[in-house]
Amino acid sequence: MMNKKVIAVALALALAGGSYAQDDTAKKKVKAYMVSDAHLDTQWNWDIQTTINEYVWNTISQNLFLLKKYPEYVFNFEGGVKYAWMKEYYPEQYEEMKKFIEEGRWHIAGSSWEASDVLVPSVEASIRNIMLGQTYYRQEFGKEGTDIFLPDCFGFGWTLPTIAAHCGLIGFSSQKLDWRNHPFYGKSKHPFTIGLWKGIDGKQVMLAHGYDYGRKWNNEDLSKNKDLEKLAQRTPLNTVYRYYGTGDIGGSPTLGSVRSVEQGIKGDGPVEVISATSDQLFKDYLPFNNHPELPVFDGELLMDVHLSLIHI
C-alpha cells in the first residue's frame, strides 16, 4: 500500500514538473539574439586622423565603460586595422580591452583586416583580407573570427559563402538589403531573415539579417517587446537576429539600449533575450545538416542602390 502511495506521489510530481516545463517553454517561445555593434567606416566624409583621434577613441573608451558597468553587455567590433590603431594610439585601453576579449565579452566580429566591399575585389584579394585579419587576431588575442560581418556593404556576390566556407568561417550577417528600393525575391528585399546561403561550389554558411544597426531602445524590458516578437515570427525558427548600436562613426550603443537588453535578459516576457556575439546564432545551429528547418538560398544578394560606390 505504501509503495502505491509513493508511486502515486512520484507520478504527480513528474506530471507537475512536466506542466511547469511546458509553461516555461510557452513563456519563452521566441528567441532574440541581440547583437551590439558600432560600425566604423575607416574613411568616408573625413580623413584617417579624424577616424583615429575621434572615432576609434570613442569606440574603445565608451565600450570599456559599458563593459565595466553592465555585466551582461557584449560588444561586437569588426576590422583588424582599427584594432591595430587602438594598439598604437591607445595602448593602455587596448590592454584593458584584451582582458574583455579573453572573457568573451568584447567580441571580434568578422574575420578580416578591413570590412570592405566584396563585389569589386577579386577572390584572392578577399581571401587575403581574411588571412591578414585572422593572423592579427591570432597573434594579438589568441583567437580568430568565425564569421563575415558586413552591416554596411553594398551587395554580396555568389562567391562570398564559398570564400567564407573555405576560410573556415560559418556565418554571414548584414542589414544592407533593407536599403533596396524594390523587392528582389518575390515581394521581399531578401530571401529570408535566417537560413543557409549556398555558394557557387555548394559550400554553405549560415545567413542572418540584422535589421538596422542604429536601433535604440530607452530603458524597456525587451522580453516584452512586440516588435522583436513579430520579427522572430517571420522565421520558422521563431528567432530574430537583431543588431543595435550605431553606424559609420563608431562609438557605442546608447545607455538606454544596453539597459533594455539587461532588463530583457532578466525579464519574464515571451521573448528570451540573449546578449549575443555576432556568431552565437551560427554556433547554436551547428552542425547545419541537423537543421532541415533552415531554408536555403542559392544565388546572389544584390543591391539596387549605391551602384556606383565602393565602400572601405
Language model features: what each stretch is:
Residues 16-20:
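C-terminal segment of classical bacterial N-terminal signal peptides
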Residues 22-310:
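Catalytic-domain carbohydrate-binding cleft regions of carbohydrate-active enzymes
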